[in-house]
Swiss-Prot record:
PANTHER family: TRANSLATIONALLY CONTROLLED TUMOR PROTEIN-RELATED, TRANSLATIONALLY-CONTROLLED TUMOR PROTEIN. Residues 70-172 are annotated as: Required for reduction of TSC22D1 protein stability. GO terms for cellular component: cytoplasmic microtubule; cytosol; extracellular space; multivesicular body; nucleoplasm; nucleus; spindle pole. Keywords: Calcium, Cytoplasm, Phosphoprotein. Disulfide bonds: none annotated. This is Translationally-controlled tumor protein. It comes from the Eukaryota. GO terms for biological process: negative regulation of ectoderm development; negative regulation of intrinsic apoptotic signaling pathway in response to DNA damage; response to virus; spermatogenesis; stem cell population maintenance. It comes from Mus musculus (Mouse).
Amino acid sequence: MIIYRDLISHDELFSDIYKIREIADGLCLEVEGKMVSRTEGAIDDSLIGGNASAEGPEGEGTESTVVTGVDIVMNHHLQETSFTKEAYKKYIKDYMKSLKGKLEEQKPERVKPFMTGAAEQIKHILANFNNYQFFIGENMNPDGMVALLDYREDGVTPFMIFFKDGLEMEKC
């Protein structure tokens, strides 16, 4: 299994269990997820090691809730954040500067293609700004990558977009 982490914050963003494809001439990865519902807080009687009490109401003290969301977000504990268009422009400018610095250290051959392609991709993001939900890693590092969540034309299938050069891969 491959875990994809944020190059700057080192937060886990997604893994290779999802359908992943390159978009924007290899600049970004599009990761397709699905909507899931999970029950949280339920306690299985078989784990208690005894019989359920004959007295008192059934299930007393065990509250369970059903949580529905996108599997990528839930599995990797991504945190939703919000931006105005102006705030996102400021964030993405700072993020590109940080990422450019990291690329100059680690992959200097990627700096020029990344900076050229990123400008086009950012224009596309800003043109479709209202379609996106924004997510950051579990540690909520404001300098890390902000992943974009959108839905296919069917309105049901979620997908997330990540800058490929902002990711590091870890084999498990």
